[in-house]
Amino acid sequence: MDRRRELLERKVELERMLAEYKESNRIQFFQPFEHQQRTLDLINAGKKVVLLQGANQIGKTTLGAVVVGSACLGIQPWDMRPTVWGKRKVECRIICQDWEHHADGVIVPELKRWLPKGRYVVRKNNIGVEAYWEFPETGSTIELMTDSQPTELHEGW
Protein backbone atom coordinates (compact mmCIF):
# COMPACT_ATOMS: atom_id res chain seq x y z
CA MET A 1 0.00 0.00 0.00
CA ASP A 2 2.88 2.39 0.74
CA ARG A 3 4.33 1.87 -2.74
CA ARG A 4 0.99 2.69 -4.31
CA ARG A 5 0.69 5.87 -2.23
CA GLU A 6 4.26 6.87 -3.17
CA LEU A 7 3.49 6.39 -6.86
CA LEU A 8 0.26 8.37 -6.58
CA GLU A 9 2.06 11.22 -4.80
CA ARG A 10 4.79 11.15 -7.44
CA LYS A 11 2.17 11.26 -10.20
CA VAL A 12 0.49 14.27 -8.61
CA GLU A 13 3.86 16.03 -8.26
CA LEU A 14 4.78 15.32 -11.90
CA GLU A 15 1.41 16.60 -13.10
CA ARG A 16 1.93 19.78 -11.06
CA MET A 17 5.42 20.22 -12.55
CA LEU A 18 4.09 19.68 -16.08
CA ALA A 19 1.30 22.23 -15.56
CA GLU A 20 3.85 24.73 -14.23
CA TYR A 21 6.15 24.11 -17.20
CA LYS A 22 3.29 24.55 -19.67
CA GLU A 23 2.26 27.79 -17.98
CA SER A 24 5.83 29.16 -18.13
CA ASN A 25 6.44 27.99 -21.71
CA ARG A 26 3.01 28.40 -23.26
CA ILE A 27 4.43 29.23 -26.71
CA GLN A 28 5.75 25.65 -26.99
CA PHE A 29 2.18 24.38 -26.75
CA PHE A 30 0.64 26.90 -29.18
CA GLN A 31 -1.81 25.22 -31.55
CA PRO A 32 -2.84 27.61 -34.30
CA PHE A 33 -6.40 27.81 -35.52
CA GLU A 34 -6.86 27.28 -39.26
CA HIS A 35 -6.84 31.01 -40.08
CA GLN A 36 -3.77 31.52 -37.89
CA GLN A 37 -1.98 28.65 -39.65
CA ARG A 38 -2.74 30.18 -43.05
CA THR A 39 -1.22 33.44 -41.84
CA LEU A 40 1.84 31.60 -40.48
CA ASP A 41 2.21 29.81 -43.81
CA LEU A 42 2.30 33.17 -45.62
CA ILE A 43 4.90 34.53 -43.18
CA ASN A 44 7.01 31.37 -43.49
CA ALA A 45 6.78 31.63 -47.29
CA GLY A 46 8.57 34.99 -47.01
CA LYS A 47 5.64 37.34 -47.59
CA LYS A 48 6.62 40.84 -46.48
CA VAL A 49 3.10 42.11 -45.74
CA VAL A 50 0.43 39.89 -44.20
CA LEU A 51 -2.98 40.98 -42.91
CA LEU A 52 -5.18 39.06 -40.50
CA GLN A 53 -8.40 40.88 -39.79
CA GLY A 54 -11.56 39.68 -38.16
CA ALA A 55 -13.91 39.85 -35.22
CA ASN A 56 -12.87 40.11 -31.59
CA GLN A 57 -11.53 37.00 -29.85
CA ILE A 58 -10.31 35.11 -32.94
CA GLY A 59 -6.64 35.14 -31.91
CA LYS A 60 -5.18 38.13 -33.75
CA THR A 61 -3.28 39.43 -30.72
CA THR A 62 -2.21 35.93 -29.74
CA LEU A 63 -0.83 35.29 -33.21
CA GLY A 64 1.02 38.60 -33.11
CA ALA A 65 2.59 37.70 -29.77
CA VAL A 66 3.75 34.25 -30.89
CA VAL A 67 5.08 35.49 -34.25
CA VAL A 68 7.05 38.32 -32.65
CA GLY A 69 8.16 36.01 -29.84
CA SER A 70 9.34 33.30 -32.22
CA ALA A 71 11.19 35.90 -34.30
CA CYS A 72 13.05 37.00 -31.16
CA LEU A 73 13.75 33.40 -30.10
CA GLY A 74 14.92 32.39 -33.58
CA ILE A 75 12.67 29.33 -33.70
CA GLN A 76 8.97 28.49 -33.68
CA PRO A 77 8.83 26.66 -30.34
CA TRP A 78 5.49 24.98 -31.10
CA ASP A 79 6.87 22.98 -34.05
CA MET A 80 10.63 23.53 -33.62
CA ARG A 81 10.91 24.93 -37.16
CA PRO A 82 13.32 27.79 -37.78
CA THR A 83 11.75 31.17 -38.44
CA VAL A 84 12.18 33.00 -41.73
CA TRP A 85 14.47 35.38 -39.82
CA GLY A 86 16.75 32.60 -38.58
CA LYS A 87 18.59 32.87 -35.27
CA ARG A 88 19.94 36.33 -35.98
CA LYS A 89 19.16 39.42 -33.95
CA VAL A 90 15.83 41.01 -34.90
CA GLU A 91 14.37 44.31 -33.73
CA CYS A 92 10.57 44.31 -33.51
CA ARG A 93 8.22 47.19 -32.92
CA ILE A 94 4.61 46.91 -31.87
CA ILE A 95 2.63 50.10 -32.41
CA CYS A 96 -0.20 50.45 -29.89
CA GLN A 97 -3.12 52.87 -29.82
CA ASP A 98 -2.21 54.18 -26.36
CA TRP A 99 -0.07 53.28 -23.34
CA GLU A 100 -2.69 52.68 -20.66
CA HIS A 101 -5.37 50.62 -22.38
CA HIS A 102 -3.80 49.00 -25.43
CA ALA A 103 -0.10 48.62 -24.54
CA ASP A 104 -0.42 47.97 -20.80
CA GLY A 105 -3.88 46.41 -20.83
CA VAL A 106 -3.71 44.18 -23.94
CA ILE A 107 -0.27 43.78 -25.53
CA VAL A 108 1.94 43.40 -22.42
CA PRO A 109 -0.31 40.74 -20.81
CA GLU A 110 -0.44 38.79 -24.09
CA LEU A 111 3.34 38.87 -24.51
CA LYS A 112 3.77 37.73 -20.89
CA ARG A 113 1.21 34.99 -21.43
CA TRP A 114 2.97 33.48 -24.46
CA LEU A 115 6.68 34.25 -24.18
CA PRO A 116 8.81 31.75 -22.24
CA LYS A 117 9.55 32.99 -18.73
CA GLY A 118 13.22 33.58 -18.02
CA ARG A 119 14.22 34.05 -21.67
CA TYR A 120 13.74 37.83 -21.79
CA VAL A 121 14.43 40.93 -19.71
CA VAL A 122 11.89 43.76 -19.55
CA ARG A 123 12.36 47.48 -18.92
CA LYS A 124 9.63 49.99 -18.20
CA ASN A 125 9.30 53.33 -19.92
CA ASN A 126 8.78 56.67 -18.12
CA ILE A 127 5.03 55.94 -17.88
CA GLY A 128 5.62 52.62 -16.11
CA VAL A 129 4.67 50.37 -19.03
CA GLU A 130 6.91 47.38 -19.82
CA ALA A 131 7.82 48.75 -23.22
CA TYR A 132 11.24 47.26 -23.96
CA TRP A 133 11.85 43.50 -24.10
CA GLU A 134 15.31 42.05 -24.72
CA PHE A 135 16.20 38.44 -25.46
CA PRO A 136 19.82 37.96 -24.28
CA GLU A 137 20.30 34.66 -26.15
CA THR A 138 19.75 36.26 -29.56
CA GLY A 139 20.14 39.98 -28.82
CA SER A 140 16.65 40.49 -30.27
CA THR A 141 14.30 43.16 -28.94
CA ILE A 142 10.64 44.09 -28.86
CA GLU A 143 9.84 47.78 -28.46
CA LEU A 144 6.32 49.00 -27.76
CA MET A 145 5.38 52.41 -29.12
CA THR A 146 2.13 54.31 -29.60
CA ASP A 147 0.73 55.99 -32.66
CA SER A 148 0.41 59.20 -30.63
CA GLN A 149 4.19 59.50 -30.31
CA PRO A 150 5.94 61.96 -32.64
CA THR A 151 6.74 60.57 -36.08
CA GLU A 152 10.46 61.19 -35.53
CA LEU A 153 10.49 58.54 -32.79
CA HIS A 154 9.18 55.96 -35.24
CA GLU A 155 11.94 56.65 -37.75
CA GLY A 156 14.93 54.33 -37.60
CA TRP A 157 16.33 52.66 -34.55
Language-model features: locations:
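Phosphate/NTP-binding elements of NTP-utilizing enzymes
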Residues: M1-W157
